[in-house]
Amino acid sequence: MSEERETLREKLLSPRKNGYDRIKAEELQAMERYCGLYKTFLQQGKTERECARVAVEVAEKAGFKPYERGTALTAGDKIYRVNRDKSVMLAVIGRESLAQGAHIVAAHIDSPRLDLKPNPLYEDSELAFFKTHYYGGIRKYQWVTIPLELHGVVAKKDGTVVPVRLGEGDEAKFVITDLLPHLGGEQGKKPLNEAVPGESLNILLGSCPSGEEDEKDRVKMHIREKLFAKYGITEDDFTSAELEAVPAAQPTDIGLDASLIGAYGHDDRVCGYAGLRAILELTSPAKTAVCMLADKEEIGSMGVTGMQSAAFDTFMHDLCDGQGVPLRACYENSFCLSCDVTAAYDPNFPEVFEKRNAAFVNYGVGLCKYTGARGKSGASDASAETVAYVRRVLDEADVLWHISELGKVDAGGGGTVAMYMANRNIATLDAGVPVLSMHAPFETVAKLDCYMTYKGCKAIYEAE
């Protein structure tokens, strides 16, 4: 092939390349450092409350202050607001007026899990169990026979809130039992999504009785006594509790080359941490940078801590009010990176992916012009101009990225917070880390993609 022809091909075509063939050698150490911090974040935050608490802790160490309505702000000021201990909004005030808009990274810090029912504790056949109600789109069969922990809070009538963390470290774990294959013939004939009914996701708590032999429910009573001794909570207190069963597995490197990270909660804490870490490192951006760590995305972003709540609007209104800028005027000139994970192409399940438009591990940030299902139902569908803007910003910052869709057109679908940000008249584009085994109790991501997503968030914050 002639040199002229080869030059023309390079100009007109854009073949995808593995990120390790493109990343600068000096960035590999920075990538490992970043991923080490991310694994620590995952280890400390297995629920949305814990993630919010850790986010505030690291933000305060970076100089962020809690924002009180009416406080005068100047360029470079670093502030945050916590919404009901479950979501966090952080901002670094820009040099330009908010009339010129803000640059926002919105991610979520809730993940699929098993919540305890309001009246969860019972005994059957001298075994004690907790009843659960699954949260988010789980594949129920994946949650049986794996070690579990219990995290959350119990709110008492007197207003006391008791934090609960059971099963950590060397502590005894919990588990949901399953049928042995010798007796599982009928179960095996059922469709995968029916083989393990939601009502059978009961957590095994113990088997040791207490008290006298003629007492009723002695195993349940033994569990009650232990919970009261450790936390001072009674059976009635479960009525006002938020207790979540989460996988006990700790974040770990995956592969002989340690190029991947396996953990619970990559969706979407891998993007939430990217947005958080990037804003912590800002000094005085041109436009006000805002990081939104939302709750409730996995069940539709509803409720007071979800992205559909007015909490974000209230925070932004307070910032705009301090500059005499109408909120809607700020929104129409703002940009939001809806930072959420996407499905990584899995060669073990090629039938659900359209390979030319799939996200790949180690190819950098996966940009998604639209999500939704079937005919783009439930998608914000970013404009061509918005996608072009992000392309330019990422390229200028040497961020590796590739365009992607979730899967084949009629294979299924999914959604993010993008539509709720776009409904506010904020130009929005989805982008995030490609994930293998998304929504499983143990998901896998590539370190390179994690690092590039952090770089991408920082580039958006710093863009003119």
PLM segments and residue spans:
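N-terminal hydrophobic/helix-forming segments and targeting peptides
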Residues: 1-464
